[in-house]
Structure formats: structure tokens, C-alpha cells
């Protein structure tokens, strides 16, 4: 019967190892899909086995796109060999050839299967119509006995509990029906003729065993090792039977005994199926209700005859050669047994072997209990592979071992039939097979994966780097463990930075409002100071220019503070984005510059973002105080100066004996602190001093006329001179002193 795309897709998923299947699920959840296709929920994909995963792919994406998506994910996860095999198997040319060759056989087999189902299991058609998922998988994956039937099966199983226990304790107990955990399908004679030249594919375990045999023989001709690859649909524990060439006759005889038991099991299954005992056993609840076991009479007879004829021919030829006087070669016997097993089992034949395969298959109770026990256990353990849990769709059946302990040995029935030497060799091979090839390799040591992380150097290292002198005494941990710790640190820093960002956003509006108030106050003070200065007969023009310059620099300082604030906020956003991107990076990229990134995050504080330079507030406060003081003093000075300097002809006589006091005038002049440098704050005292002539301690009497001359002409002349001198009094002569930083204006 020709395989369909669904079969090839399921076989490909079953070929994946556990960690490869998890990687496939993760890539399936993260890869981009075409338009019109929805993503499968993660909760369904997470715990799905190959069968359920195939059903989900077909349900959500259809047969064609499911195959294309599987090919895309396999290539993305470096499973190129499986991708090529699936591509060749599902190509249009291959499918056309298979459909042309096995179309008639498949149709006849399906009709016969339907006839057996209709006669043996009444009501199964209705169950298949109610189940929407049964149409997705091939007919060999159809499920029977759902719903209330499971409860009745469980009850009947509980009732038969003591009987099953008694059958397990009896050494010669035999099973009631040959129920296995796999579905048995054979090829028709047409398939045999069309595919006579096809050779069964060797599994990965066989290739590794052949390679190890060739290496141990030191360049001699490697013997071809063959195995029975038992495909599994429902349970991940699938067994393989590697047959190696032995040099001892007892072990070869054990292989023949095991082979004969398997042949008896196949014939017993055929007879039980023809007599209708399979359906009866399923109804009693001993077998597995998930899978129907149907065997066509013609195909079963062909398979049995094929096995018997092949065994007779090869065994007769082998024993005849040894009986003619030639030496008895164990290699020939091993090759004969291997050929018998592999020739009798094609890739389409699925044998169901339980945990107690070595028991006599003629015992119905024993086989039934083994099948039920195998069904109840969801996890299987292989002593040769040393793997437990949900294995991929291929494992191994141990037939022989290079040590003295063999699986057929009755002394080793209560323990694992494998020696410590085989365990160590197989453990090394499994580690090599499961080593991740996508991890970055060490730049110093080729073909060494960086699986460790040095805490002192903050960098990933390999095992050889760990043993080097450079990392002696350093704290070294697995990179996964270190990545978890650093991810936790990144998460904490992200939470802190996000809280800081929220705090900054909350205080952003008040800060802007304060800046606007500062600018308004500055502009108001500028206007209030500019008006009195203009009214004081323009003798404060230079003072006004200096003051305006100082205010402009103050405005620029406030603007720089605002720019600094926005710059810090942008840096905070950039740092948050870098940390978010760093958190999603793979482990080996995450650990490259983790120290510098965390240091930047730890040094970022909210005070840097919201902190206003302390000099700005002090300058504004000082400006406010000094401006008010200058306004009052200038007003007083203007009024007093106007009253004191208003010279007229009527006031000359009355003010004849009164001279203006320099100390009094000096007290009326304000002291103003100015900022002349934009980068540094410099306080200057503006002092109006009288210009002293050489040798005099008091200013000359410029403003008062002589009392000796009191004519109107002279009075007019003195009045003009006084006005001229008063104008010269209003002229500024600024001088800057670097020692005391005082600005003095003299006249």
C-alpha cells in the first residue's frame, strides 16, 4: 500500500529526537505564516506528540501547506537530511509513481479492511463519522472504542485484575490474544514484485554500530548490520532489533529462538484475526482501544509464507555448508539471521512488541497483560539507549550484546540485559547524536561548543578553555544557568527603569511649568529693570546692556537645562530598548557584553534626569532680590538725584551753603551682582564713585558756584556749567578688577 503525504509527514516527525521535537515545536510557534493561516495555540503544541502534532498541522494548514511548513522548519533547525527525504517522498513525481504502483493494492486493502471492520466491530462507522479528526490520518491510525466504551473497558479491566495478577505470577502462563501496541500491516504480492529491488533503510543506530564495528576491526571489511525498524503511531516507545555477528554458537542459537518466537507471534496474530478473536479481546478491555488491529487474510498468508521460505532456504544453505566439513562460521550465521529479519520486515510492516517479547506468544493471558501493561505506561526506558520518557518514533529492540550478558539469557531476566562497557559506549554515542550543532563554536578550539560561562571574564567558554591556565580558579557555570540569572537581573533592571521612566513622566509637566514660570519672571524683571534705567537720563545705559546680557545668558542656561533633560530621557529610552532586545537574544549573544550593559543600567538614576543645576535656582532667586532692591534704590536715587541736581536760579542762593555729600550719594547707589561669563558665575559690585583729582580727598565743587560773583549773567553761566558738569557726572567709566571681581564706575 503506497504511502501518502500524511504518512511521510508523520514518519518525519517521528524521526526527530526529543530535544529536536521541542525545537520543532518552538520554531513552529515563532515562524511566520502565509496570509489566511492562523497560528496553532501554544497550549496544544506544547504537549503534542508526533501523531497529535501531525493532526494539528493538517487541521490548521491542510495537507499541502503542512508539508511545506514542515520542510521550512526542518531546514531552519538544521534537519536538512530529514527535509530532503520528506521533499523527495512528497514530491509530485514520487507521489505519482507510488500512486500508480500501489493504487490497486491500496484500494483492495481498504475494501478488505472495511469488510473486516464491518463484520467484527459493529457500530464503528458511526464512531468514525462523529470523530472529525479520524479523516486526517491514514486508515491505519483510526481510533475505535471512544466515549462510554472506555469506561466500560476500565470497569472490565478492574474486574479481571486478580486474573491478570495470577497470570503474571505463573511462569508458563500464555496470553489469550496476541494484542500488541502497534498496528500490523503487510504488503501485497503486487507491492513485492514492484519493489523487489528496494532495500530497507538502515536506522541511525545501525549506521553507528556498523561504523564502530569497522573501527574495531582496524580497517577490515565492515559487516553490514541490519535491523528491524518498528514504526510506532501511538506510543513513543518503538523498539529496534540490531543484529551483530557473533562468534559463539550459543548466542546464535538464542537469536534463532527469538526469531522463531517472533514468527509464531505473527502466525498467531494472523489466526486470531481471521477467527475474530481480536475484536473479542478489544471488547474485553485487554488490548489497546486507540488502534484497530486488522490483518488481511491474503496478505498475512503471503507474509507468513515469505518468512518461512526465506528462513528455510538460508538456514538450509548455511547448515549444509557447515555440515560438508567446512568450519562453522558465526559470521555467516549472523548475516543469515539478519537477512531473514530484514527481508521479512519491510518498512510498511509494523510489528507490535511489548515489554515481555521473550515470553511464549502462545500464552493468551500473558500477551494480553503485556499489551495492557504497555498501554498503561506512558514512558518507556531502553537500557541500551539510556533514555526515558517520550522517545521519538524509533528506538531499539536489543537482540544481542558484545558482552556475555545477552537479552535471551534467563539469568538476566530481572535486570537490564546490557553490560557496563556497552552502556558507556552507547552513552558516548547518544551524547554525540544529541549534541546541539547550532550552538556557536569556540574561536580558540575548533569543534568545541561554548557550553560554559566564566563569571570573572564575563564571556562564554568551552570545556577546553575551562581547563586552560587563563581560567584556572575562576567561577565557571553552565551557560544556561548563568543566562537564567542574568535574565533575572535584566528583568529587575527593566522594572526599575520603567518605574523611573514613569516617575519622570509624572514630573515632566511640573518641570516644564516651572521653567515657563522662570522665564516669565525673568522677562518681567527685565521689563521692570529696563524702564527705570531708561528714565535715569541714560546714565545707566551700559548697566542696562550688561544686565540684559546676563539675563540672556541665564535664559540660555535654562534652555540648556531643558535640552539636557530631553537628552537624558532619550538616553533612558535607548537603554530600555537595548535591554529589551538583549533579553530576547540567544544565550551566547546575551552573554557577550552583559557586564557593560548592566553597568549602564545600574548607573542610571532619576536624579540625573530630574535634577536642575543648583546654580540656576540661586541665580533666579538672587536676580529677584537684587532687581527689587535695585528698583527701589534707583527710584530713590532718581528722586533724590532729581531733587538734588535740579539747579535753577532761585535755588542757587538757598543752596549756597549746602554741599552734596558724597557719602550720602554713594549710599543711594545700588549694588548689583552680574553674570558676565556664560560658563562661570561672576558677581560684580557696581559702585558709583566720584573721580578724585590728584592730591584731593574730596571731589571738587563742580555743582556749586562761587559766592563772590552773584550777578544774573554769572548765575546763568554757572547754571550752564553745572548742567555740563552734571552730564559729565552721568558718563560711565567702568573698570574691571580681577582680584575682587568688582565693577566700578567712576566719574
From Swiss-Prot:
Mention any one GO cellular component term assigned to this protein in its UniProt record. Answer: nucleoplasm
A Pfam family name for this chain?
PYRIN
Q: Where is this region: Disordered?
A: 89-181, 698-720
- Which residues of this UniProt protein bind Zn(2+)? 442, 445, 465, 471
InterPro entries (UniProt xref): DAPIN (IPR004020), DEATH-like_dom_sf (IPR011029), TRIM/RBCC (IPR050143), Znf_B-box (IPR000315)
**Keyword Nuclease among record annotations:** no
- PTM statement from Swiss-Prot or TrEMBL: Degraded along with the delivery of its substrates to autolysosomal compartments (at protein level).
- Kindly provide the name given to this protein in its UniProt entry: Pyrin
Which lineage do the record's taxonomy fields give for this organism? Eukaryota, Metazoa, Chordata, Craniata, Vertebrata
The gene from which this protein is expressed is Mefv
Amino acid at each position: 500500500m503506497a504511502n501518502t503525504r500524511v504518512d511521510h509527514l508523520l514518519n518525519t516527525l517521528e524521526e526527530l529526537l526529543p530535544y529536536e521535537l521541542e525545537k520543532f515545536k518552538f520554531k513552529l510557534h515563532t515562524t511566520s505564516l502565509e496570509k489566511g493561516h492562523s497560528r496553532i495555540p501554544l497550549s496544544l503544541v506544547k504537549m503534542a506528540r508526533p501523531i497529535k502534532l501531525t493532526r494539528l498541522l493538517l487541521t490548521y494548514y491542510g495537507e499541502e501547506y503542512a508539508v511545506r511548513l514542515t520542510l521550512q522548519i526542518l531546514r531552519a533547525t538544521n534537519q536538512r537530511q530529514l527535509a530532503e527525504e520528506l521533499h523527495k517522498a512528497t514530491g509530485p513525481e514520487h507521489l505519482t509513481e507510488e500512486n500508480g504502483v500501489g493504487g490497486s493494492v491500496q484500494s483492495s486493502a481498504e475494501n478488505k479492511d472495511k469488510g473486516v471492520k464491518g463484520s467484527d466491530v459493529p457500530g464503528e462507522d458511526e464512531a468514525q463519522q462523529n470523530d472529525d479528526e479520524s479523516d486526517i490520518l491514514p486508515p491505519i491510525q483510526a481510533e475505535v472504542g471512544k466515549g462510554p466504551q472506555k469506561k466500560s473497558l476500565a470497569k472490565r479491566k478492574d474486574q479481571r485484575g486478580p486474573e491478570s495478577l495470577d497470570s503474571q505470577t505463573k511462569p508458563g502462563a500464555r496470553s489469550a490474544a496476541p494484542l500488541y501496541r502497534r498496528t500490523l500491516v503487510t504488503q501485497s504480492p503486487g507491492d513485492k514484485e514492484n519493489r523487489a529491488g528496494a532495500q530497507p533503510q538502515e536506522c541511525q543506530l545501525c549506521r553507528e554500530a556498523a561504523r564502530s564495528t569497522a573501527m574495531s576491526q582496524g580497517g577490515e571489511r565492515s559487516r553490514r548490520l541490519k535491523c528491524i525498524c518498528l514504526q510506532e503511531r501511538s506510543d513513543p516507545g518503538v523498539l529496534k532489533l540490531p543484529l551483530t555477528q557473533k562468534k559463539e554458537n550459543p548466542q546464535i542459537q538464542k537469536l534463532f529462538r527469538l526469531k522463531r518466537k517472533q514468527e509464531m507471534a505473527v502466525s498467531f496474530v494472523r489466526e486470531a484475526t481471521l477467527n475474530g478473536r481480536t475484536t473479542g479481546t478489544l471488547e474485553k478491555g485487554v488490548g489497546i482501544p486507540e488502534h484497530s488491529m486488522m490483518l488481511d487474510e491474503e496478505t498475512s498468508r503471503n507474509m507468513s509464507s515469505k518468512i518461512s521460505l526465506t528462513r528455510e532456504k538460508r538456514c538450509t544453505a548455511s547448515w549444509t555448508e557447515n555440515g560438508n566439513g567446512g568450519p562453522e562460521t558465526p559470521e555467516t550465521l549472523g548475516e543469515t539471521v539478519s537477512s531473514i529479519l530484514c527481508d521479512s520486515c519491510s518498512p510498511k510492516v509494523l510489528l507490535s512488541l511489548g515489554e515481555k517479547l521473550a515470553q511464549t506468544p502462545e500464552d493468551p493471558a500473558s500477551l494480553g497483560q503485556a499489551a495492557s501493561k504497555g498501554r498503561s505506561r506512558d514512558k518507556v526506558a531502553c537500557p541500551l539507549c539510556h533514555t526515558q520518557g517520550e522517545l521519538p518514533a524509533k528506538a531499539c529492540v536489543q537482540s544481542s550484546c558484545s558482552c556475555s550478558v545477552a537479552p535471551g539469557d534467563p539469568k538476566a531476566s530481572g535486570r537490564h540485559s546490557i553490560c557496563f562497557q556497552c552502556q558507556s559506549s552507547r552513552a558516548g554515542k547518544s551524547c554525540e547524536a544529541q549534541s546541539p550543532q547550532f550552538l556557536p563554536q569556540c574561536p580558540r578550539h575548533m569543534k568545541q561548543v561554548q557550553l560554559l560561562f566564566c563569571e570573572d571574564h564575563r564571556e562564554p567558554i568551552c570545556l577546553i578553555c575551562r581547563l586552560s591556565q587563563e581560567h584556572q580558579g575562576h567561577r565557571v557555570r553552565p551557560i544556561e544557568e548563568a543566562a537564567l540569572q542574568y535574565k533575572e537581573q535584566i528583568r529587575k533592571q527593566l522594572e526599575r527603569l520603567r518605574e523611573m521612566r514613569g516617575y519622570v513622566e509624572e514630573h515632566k509637566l511640573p518641570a516644564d511649568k516651572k521653567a515657563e514660570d522662570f522665564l516669565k519672571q525673568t522677562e518681567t524683571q527685565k521689563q521692570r529693570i529696563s524702564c527705570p534705567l531708561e528714565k535715569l537720563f541714560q546714565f545707566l545705559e551700559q548697566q542696562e546692556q550688561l544686565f540684559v546680557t546676563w539675563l540672556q545668558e541665564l535664559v540660555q542656561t535654562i534652555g540648556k537645562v531643558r535640552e539636557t533633560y530631553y537628552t537624558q530621557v532619550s538616553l533612558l529610552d535607548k537603554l530600555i530598548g537595548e535591554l529589551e532586545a538583549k533579553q530576547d537574544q540567544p544565550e551566547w549573544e546575551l552573554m557577550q557584553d552583559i557586564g557593560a550593559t548592566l553597568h549602564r543600567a545600574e548607573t542610571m538614576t532619576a536624579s540625573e534626569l530630574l535634577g536642575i543645576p543648583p546654580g540656576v535656582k540661586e541665580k533666579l532667586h538672587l536676580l529677584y532680590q537684587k532687581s527689587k532692591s535695585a528698583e527701589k534704590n534707583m527710584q530713590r536715587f532718581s528722586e533724590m538725584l532729581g531733587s538734588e541736581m535740579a539747579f535753577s536760579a532761585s535755588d542757587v542762593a538757598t543752596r549756597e551753603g549746602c554741599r552734596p555729600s558724597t557719602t550720602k550719594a554713594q549710599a543711594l547707589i545700588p549694588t548689583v551682582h552680574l553674570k558676565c561669563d556664560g560658563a562661570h558665575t561672576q558677581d560684580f559690585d557696581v559702585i558709583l564713585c566720584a573721580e578724585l583729582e590728584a592730591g584731593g580727598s574730596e571731589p571738587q565743587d563742580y555743582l556749586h558756584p562761587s559766592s563772590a560773583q552773584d550777578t544774573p549773567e554769572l548765575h546763568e553761566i554757572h547754571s550752564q556749567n553745572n548742567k555740563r558738569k552734571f552730564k559729565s557726572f552721568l558718563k560711565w567709566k567702568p573698570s574691571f578688577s580681577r582680584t575682587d571681581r568688582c565693577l566700578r564706575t567712576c566719574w
